[in-house]
UniProtKB/Swiss-Prot annotation:
GTP-binding found in the keyword field: no
Lipidation (N-myristoyl glycine): G2
Binding site for Ca(2+): D73, D75, N77, R79, E84
Pfam family, one: EF-hand_7
Family that this chain belongs to: Belongs to the recoverin family.
Domain of life of the native organism: Eukaryota
Transmembrane segments: none
Transferase recorded as keyword: no
Name of the featured protein: Calcium-binding protein L
Residue ranges occupied by any EF-hand domain in the UniProt entry: 25-59, 60-95, 96-131
Amino acid sequence: MGQGNSKLSSDDIKKIMSKTNYTSEQVSQILKDYQSVNQDSKGLSLEEFKSFFSIRFKDYDDASILHMFKIFDSDKNGRISFKEFVGALFIITKSPVSDKLSFLFDMFDRDLNGYLDLEESYNILKLALNTSVGLGFDVSQAGSFAEGLLNSMNRNSHGGITKEEFIKKASVNDTFVRMLCLYQSYDTLLY
């Protein structure tokens, strides 16, 4: 799938469906929406990303949208590919907590070693904090989760946290889960 992503192969659609639980129709609608803002077919620029998300998240300021853009631009090329776009939507829509946490882990395990190291964990926490601030949470509410995550990493000989450890630790922290899963009021606007 190139940056323009004008067509998805059936394998691409199946992969997206298996990772996100979106239906084939939803994937098609997401692609249509993506293409409607991807004017130059090179992936979403920051301005295109802002135009899509600012309609759906009216209370987000430019700094929050920029931060989301930087986080979801996983290859750091200044463009949001369709794969990155689907990831962004999946994270901010109402999906099962364990699926969302699994996806978060996969998205932030950039070196694909099966562990979140300190920097990768920090990036997840930044996402949660940025999201929560945009929704009116007190930033200090994430402190206990962050501390627990970092403490468990320090106790592990591998210097990181596995997907299973992350899901277990994150899913029992109501504050962290709410910070990432608060988009229920946006259900009708998102997928």
